[in-house]
């Protein structure tokens, strides 16, 4: 929706298809500014973006990278997210995230350079008239980051539970797709079967 509001020219490349991305970058080579936008972890299938390849390609074509890491924070990179997972600190232009998933609070995160943050705060119409977070929420956000930093056992337990759950589903014959994260889909093949399974789980 944000891209539509900017009225910028946009290209959509097939899911995680690096040759498709490169074709789009070639076609837009003459543009003054280019921004590649991707999820870090895809919420439907639980697979992750090849962010290392995306960043390499962005640098080759002089493009910026924005990653929405709502489902990677608290999960990948010892809980620090997909940028840390691929050791790309300092090479991603904008990181977006959420406190409402793994961190269990509310609110969102936009991280980038100081210039980028100042520009966004002063030019984004949707932010100009919005209020600040209540102090209690800000304190809870800070505490959630401290827990993530100081208590790595939570991320370790998450992965232990994830691997156990996936292995048990597979042993029962369920297809869990291509997920490599704690988002584990169960492929049912058709909606009728999915609805029946859902009813039995209630």
What are the language-model segments listed below?
Residues 132-151, 157, 161, 170-171:
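Structural motif of enzymes handling amino- and sulfur-group chemistry
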Residues 84-119:
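Active-site PLP attachment segment
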Residues 106, 124-133:
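A short glycine-threonine-serine/GTX helix/turn-capping micro-motif
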Residues 11, 15-67:
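Active-site phosphate-binding strand-loop segment of PLP-dependent enzymes
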Residues 6, 60-61, 172:
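Helix C-cap/helix->beta junction micro-motif
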Residues 1-6, 19:
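Substrate-binding/gating loop at the entrance of the active-site cleft, primarily
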Residues 156-165, 170-202:
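Conserved PLP-binding catalytic core of the aspartate aminotransferase-like
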């Amino acid at each position: 929706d944000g891209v539509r509001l900017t009225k910028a020219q946009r290209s959509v490349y097939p899911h995680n298809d690096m040759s498709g991305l490169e074709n789009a970058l070639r076609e837009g080579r003459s543009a003054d500014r280019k921004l590649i936008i991707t999820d870090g972890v895809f919420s439907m299938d639980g697979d992750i973006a090849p962010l290392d390849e995306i960043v390499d390609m962005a640098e080759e074509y002089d493009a910026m990278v924005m990653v929405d890491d709502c489902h990677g924070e608290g999960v990948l990179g010892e809980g620090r997210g997909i940028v840390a997972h691929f050791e790309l600190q300092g090479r991603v232009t904008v990181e977006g995230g959420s406190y409402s998933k793994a961190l269990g609070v509310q609110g969102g995160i936009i991280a980038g350079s100081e210039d980028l943050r100042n520009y966004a705060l002063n030019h984004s119409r949707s932010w100009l008239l919005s209020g600040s977070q209540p102090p209690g929420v800000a304190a809870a956000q800070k505490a959630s980051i401290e827990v993530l930093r100081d208590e790595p056992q939570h991320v370790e337990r998450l992965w232990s539970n994830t691997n156990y759950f996936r292995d048990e589903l597979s042993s029962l014959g369920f297809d869990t797709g291509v997920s490599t994260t704690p988002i584990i889909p169960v492929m049912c093949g058709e909606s009728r079967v999915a609805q029946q399974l859902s009813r039995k789980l209630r």
